[in-house]
Swiss-Prot record:
Keyword Nuclease: no
UniProt cross-references to Pfam families, sorted A to Z: PALP
Gene behind the chain: trpB
Keywords noted in UniProt: Amino-acid biosynthesis, Aromatic amino acid biosynthesis, Lyase, Pyridoxal phosphate, Tryptophan biosynthesis
Protein name: Tryptophan synthase beta chain
């Protein structure tokens, strides 16, 4: 069956749409019109492809992780190396596309939200390239966790606004960015960093990130002589790297798709971000999606060791894939992600982002289950430089606790 989502109202099955105040409706309709025009203009995509090649460094390699595969003794593991992009993660694919779109729309200023700082850095980078003014909204907690990325953004000419509302994390940064957009609609474009928000944002982000899956599909054929892998694995916060990998394979029903959610301290605690495991449908940031909420519909605080995964919702297309059982979403704890982080570093000499480490941790389990005849592609969504100090502190604290327990 042909997969034709979203419909004209921005729905993926029962999820998505645009639940925004009148003040924002004009902006999202203007954005949709401009995006449709750009899709119909071959020069837009040609220019973007040239930038992706010459500036970002695409295409990124599909790397056969031979050591990891042998270490596990299961399915062959191929890593889609989004960590090798300029700025160190998949985020630049979308940021560059949207800044180029904003420039074409005649906008002068760019605003964005960021959690781990990767989308903020990517947006500030693209804004610098196109000589546009840039403000990044970041939860105060994340500003503390990701001080290095804050400095990077400032170095790139962006202004970083620390958001002190709510729990001072990603969802609060999104709220602040949306408020700013309402106040400055005429000359400002808001670059959402994940496949979230009111239509057409989830579609735009998916389309710009689908370069991941398109490349991986062709590279897998070229490398193996086989048509398709047996499985895909990607971490899911809002879900843009995962939708970028999954979407070009969605009609290939022999390919199993797995999104790994942040289970934090465990899905049976209050400290996790496992939206599809524990959430239910609700409206957040202009879109109907699965959301972590209490009995009264209040949004719960999401928790993860990884700043890029602690979002209490998930992109509507992922909610739809989950609903129609096209993809499975599995929780991975902080502890498991830390093991994945160390394992890939030690065995392959690749230090992954904590976000990507959630995918690695599950891939290890899945490889054992599938066995050596099968193969999978794992999206290595970002590099781990930004997380090394945090992991060092965490491992040292864990070791000290163990020492006390043995004393």
């Amino acid at each position: 069956m042909a997969y034709q989502e979203p419909n004209k109202d921005g729905f993926y099955g029962k999820f998505g749409g645009r639940f925004v105040p009148e003040t924002l409706m004009t902006a999202v309709l203007e954005l949709e019109k401009a995006y449709r025009e750009s899709q119909a203009d071959p020069s837009f995509q040609e220019e973007l492809n040239q930038l992706l090649r010459q500036y970002v460094g695409r295409e990124t390699p599909l790397y056969y992780a031979k050591n990891l595969t042998q270490h596990i003794g299961g399915a062959k593991i191929y890593l889609k190396r989004e960590d090798l992009n300029h700025t160190g993660a998949h985020k630049i694919n979308n940021a560059l596309g949207q800044v180029w779109l904003a420039k074409r729309m005649g906008k002068k200023k760019i605003i964005a939200e960021t959690g781990a700082g990767q989308h903020g850095v990517a947006t500030a980078t693209a804004a610098a390239l196109f000589n546009m003014e840039c403000t990044i909204y970041m939860g105060e907690e994340d500003v503390k966790r990701q001080a290095l990325n804050v400095f990077r953004m400032e170095l790139l000419g962006a202004k970083v606004e620390a958001v002190t509302d709510g729990s001072r994390v990603l969802k609060d940064a999104v709220n602040a960015a949306l408020r700013s957009w309402v106040a400055n609609i005429d000359d400002t474009h808001y670059i959402l960093g994940s496949a979230l928000g009111p239509h057409p944002f989830p579609e735009i982000v998916r389309d710009f990130q689908s370069v991941i899956g398109r490349e991986a599909k062709q590279q897998y054929r070229d490398m193996t002589g086989q048509n398709l892998p047996d499985a895909l694995v990607a971490c899911v916060g809002g879900g843009s790297n995962a939708i970028g990998l999954f979407h070009p394979f969605v009609e290939d029903e022999s390919v199993a798709m797995y999104g790994t959610e942040a289970a934090g301290l465990g899905v049976d605690t209050e400290h996790h971000a496992a939206t599809l495991t524990k959430g239910r449908p609700g409206v957040l940031h202009g879109s109907l999606m699965d959301v972590l909420q209490d009995a009264h519909g209040q949004i719960l605080e999401a928790f993860s060791i990884s700043a890029g995964l602690d979002y209490p919702g998930i992109g509507p297309e992922h909610s739809h894939y989950h609903d129609i059982k096209r993809a499975s979403y599995v929780p991975v704890t902080d502890e498991e992600a830390l093991e994945g982080f160390q394992l890939l570093s030690r065995v392959e000499g690749i230090i992954p982002a904590l976000e990507s480490s959630h995918a690695i941790a599950f891939a290890v389990k899945l490889a054992k289950e599938l066995g050596p005849e099968k193969s999978m592609i794992v999206c290595l969504s970002g590099r781990g430089d930004k997380d090394v100090v945090q992991v060092k502190d965490r491992l040292e604290a864990d070791a000290a606790k163990k020492g006390e327990a043995h004393a």
